[in-house]
């Protein structure tokens, strides 16, 4: 794979997506994300304030953190307002406090955290009521009654408001924390203290066996975006990338396929693992995906939100780390796709030469195309969404499970950090590792870098999914709703 430098000439523009484009629509998007947050934290104080796993924060930390983030960007950055509560920023700075340290902080009690969220939201909605179009091209708005923000360049405010970017950033941020809350529920459910919340368990479509792979011919395609108003800085700019011919599986790896890897001794065969992966496997005594266990009679169970159930063989495997995915791929004589291969298989339309916003086109996700937004607390069976297939015939690229790729998280040619370095840029460069949960030194460097994940999971909101969306995490992560699919060279 090669990127054509920083030159974006020749890039086929992707049409502007159907993202909410008015203050009223942005307000509804904010309210929708808040409904999920409040549903996942509708608990007594004890389970809200307890740390259910050193991998995660107490739920009450996430609850107030999303309010603080909203205050920072939708009140202070846009209007120049002062802090709603003194000292609030220091308490909820994710970079300052490792997750293991957060239970000891003087966090807002649940009732005060909810009151803080309501206070911030009320002020934000009042500000939204004052928005009016700016006299410049594009979807630009600003508070009509607010003077220039002290210390904030007018150009930056305009850019934050272009296409409602800053509102989309806050909406997506809250939905991402909602997915983190669900992962905490899954981890905490082992003690019987948490449930998945009040979401309705919708019936998911039946699967259909469409095993096999598709061939993606060599050639350039447009990777990333320069037009999606809600895209993060790490998705920008759109640029041309040449990808050699490759083959990629039509569907993610199933529980059935990964069980075959387990029962063939894959977790005990050092030859299949990278040195770092084998060291991690031995340290953590990995023998199967997280939440799998033997049933005592030769079968397997999966623990899902407080209950054990027979392992569903035809669902995508989830709760595997990057090292497990890599070892499985080697066992199968395959490899993980690169990030560029994944996006080309997902978005490129060879008939038009342009990239789509989603595998099926530019229309937003529907229940017929993808399993998103916590419709159910599990992935759908493989082959359940033929209507969501890409132009190459690859299915279930959006929703169900995040997918590990082979690629390190890195900047695109021409990357420019916006609106703050700590969202993307600080994660591009490998740095001295420390366990983000405990803050302990990491001499084996398992926490040194980040691998790219693509596609979204059953718990991801549709606003935080698109063909260009990039997620990233340490290669040891298993508690997230992540799986993988396999690829290989064409020759």
What is the meaning of each model-derived region?
Residues 126-132:
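Polar, glycosylation-prone regions of secreted, cell-surface, and some intracellular proteins
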Residues 170, 174-176, 180, 186-204, ...:
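Functional-site microenvironments in short loops/helix caps that host divalent-cation chemistry
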Residues 54, 158-166, 199-208:
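Membrane-interfacial loop-to-helix junctions in multi-pass inner-membrane proteins
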Residues 2-57, 61-68, 73-86, 90-123, ...:
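Disulfide-stabilized, aromatic/cysteine-rich ligand-recognition loop
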């Amino acid at each position: 794979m090669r990127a054509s430098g920083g030159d974006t000439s020749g890039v086929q523009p992707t049409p502007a997506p159907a993202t909410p484009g008015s203050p009223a629509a942005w307000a509804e998007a904010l309210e929708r994300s808040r409904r999920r947050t409040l549903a996942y934290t509708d608990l007594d104080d004890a389970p809200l304030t307890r740390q259910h796993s050193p991998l995660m924060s107490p739920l009450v930390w996430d609850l107030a953190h999303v309010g603080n983030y909203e205050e920072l960007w939708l009140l202070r950055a846009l209007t120049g307002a002062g802090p709603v509560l003194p000292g609030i920023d220091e308490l909820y700075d994710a970079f300052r406090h490792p997750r293991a340290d957060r239970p000891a902080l003087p966090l807002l009690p649940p009732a005060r955290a909810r009151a803080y969220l309501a206070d911030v939201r009320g002020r934000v909605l009042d500000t939204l009521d004052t928005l009016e179009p700016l006299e410049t091209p594009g979807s630009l708005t600003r508070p009509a009654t607010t003077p220039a923000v002290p210390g904030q360049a007018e150009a930056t405010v305009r850019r934050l408001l272009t296409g409602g970017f800053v509102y989309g950033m806050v909406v997506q941020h809250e939905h991402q924390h909602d997915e983190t809350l669900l992962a905490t529920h899954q981890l905490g459910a082992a003690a019987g203290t948490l449930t998945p919340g009040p979401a309705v368990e919708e019936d998911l479509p039946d699967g259909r066996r469409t095993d096999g792979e598709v061939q993606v011919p060599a050639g350039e395609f447009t990777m990333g975006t320069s037009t999606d108003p809600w895209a993060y800085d790490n998705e920008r700019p759109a640029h041309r990338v040449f990808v050699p011919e490759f083959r990629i599986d039509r569907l993610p790896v199933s529980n059935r396929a990964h069980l075959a890897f387990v029962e063939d001794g894959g977790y005990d065969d050092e030859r299949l693992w990278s040195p770092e992966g084998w060291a991690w496997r031995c340290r953590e005594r990995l023998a199967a995906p997280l939440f799998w266990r033997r049933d005592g009679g030769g079968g397997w169970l999966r623990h899902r939100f407080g209950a054990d159930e027979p392992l569903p063989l035809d669902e995508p495997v989830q709760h595997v780390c990057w090292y497990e995915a890599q070892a499985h791929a080697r066992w199968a004589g395959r490899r993980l796709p690169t990030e560029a291969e994944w996006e080309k298989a997902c978005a490129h339309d060879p008939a038009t030469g342009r990239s789509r916003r989603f595998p099926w086109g530019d229309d937003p996700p529907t229940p017929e195309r993808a399993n998103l937004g916590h419709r159910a607390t599990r992935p759908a069976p493989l082959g359940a969404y033929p209507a969501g297939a890409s132009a190459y015939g690859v299915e279930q690229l959006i929703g169900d499970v995040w997918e590990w790729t082979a690629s390190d998280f890195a900047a695109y040619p021409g990357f420019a950090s916006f609106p703050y370095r700590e969202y993307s840029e600080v994660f591009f460069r490998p740095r001295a590792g420390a366990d983000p949960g405990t803050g302990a030194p990491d001499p084996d460097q398992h926490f040194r870098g980040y691998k790219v994940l693509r596609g979204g999971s059953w718990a991801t909101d549709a606003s935080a999914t698109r063909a260009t969306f990039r997620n990233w995490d340490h290669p040891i992560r298993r508690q997230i709703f992540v799986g993988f699919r396999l690829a290989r060279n064409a020759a």
